[in-house]
Amino acid sequence: MNYQTILEEIEKEIQALFVEGKVASYIPALANVNPNQFSMAIKMFDGQTFGVGEIDKKFSIQSISKVFTFTLALNYYGKELYKRVSHEPSGNPFNSLVQLEYENGIPRNPFINAGAIVTADTLVSIYKNDTFNQILDFIKMVSNDKTIDFNEEIFHSELEHGFRNYALINMIKSFGNIHNDIDEVIKTYFKQCSIMMSPSQLASSMLFLANHGINPITNERILTESKAKRISSLMLTCGHYDASGDFAYKVGLPGKSGVGGGIVAIVPKKMAICVYSPKLNTQGNSLIGTKALELFTTKTGLSIF
């Protein structure tokens, strides 16, 4: 199968969609990106890369970071983690307060904001004031790339404008499900969302999940096959907020989106994919990125179903 040709076909077919969607505007630093960007990268287990667009241009990974922090936490705590954050789809917007109150401060899953904040708290319990460095080092390790870092401007923009996330962490704290200082936890969370990566780096970073826990480039086991499968299943059922069912229906791959415009997806035992296009649909997922992945699975037949 000629993946490069398929990517070039997809790039042509999505052009008409550039009139739709809006870039994230809840923090100013995200609103300033060029809305008409599109890039897509595929990483194979043998190290081959296929791509269209500027696949080495970095963007803010935002909620894609939740996959890395959940991996770290699940690796350390195992099933104990589910006492703090559940593993069910939410059906509500990613920053919803309503369900959180109804369910006594236990977030539905680690991929909505409340769940990722609790996950960050569990990591602060382990790593204390070195938590962000540990997260960043883990991402560098699974990406085989030591150049990855966060963006100070986006981090400070999140700190100044992330009011809904402050509301979430205070509500969770009131239910006793935040064990550390809330300022330390929220700063860790905002910093992880401000990490900058390219489609090429992000596709590389997901190969260990596509390979059931082993990085196929280095042959290093990152986590057990069982835990890798759990994370992949959560990506399928919860990876796109309240549009997760729609993504599973149309794309049929485990994936995770971020409001920065990125989406990662994995084809088990084959490859990892990252697509970037900053215009979002109403659920906060990349509109063109979702369509590009739908076209990819249609053209290749590589859905998990």
UniProtKB/Swiss-Prot annotation:
GO terms for biological process: glutamate biosynthetic process; glutamine catabolic process. The keyword Hydrolase applies. It comes from Aliarcobacter butzleri (strain RM4018). Keywords: Hydrolase. It is an enzyme of class 3 (hydrolase). The keyword Protein biosynthesis does not apply. Homotetramer. GO terms for molecular function: glutaminase activity. Substrate binds at residues 63, 113, 158, 165, 189, 241, 259. It catalyses: L-glutamine + H2O = L-glutamate + NH4(+). InterPro entries: Beta-lactam/transpept-like, Glutaminase. This is Glutaminase. Its EC number is 3.5.1.2. Belongs to the glutaminase family.
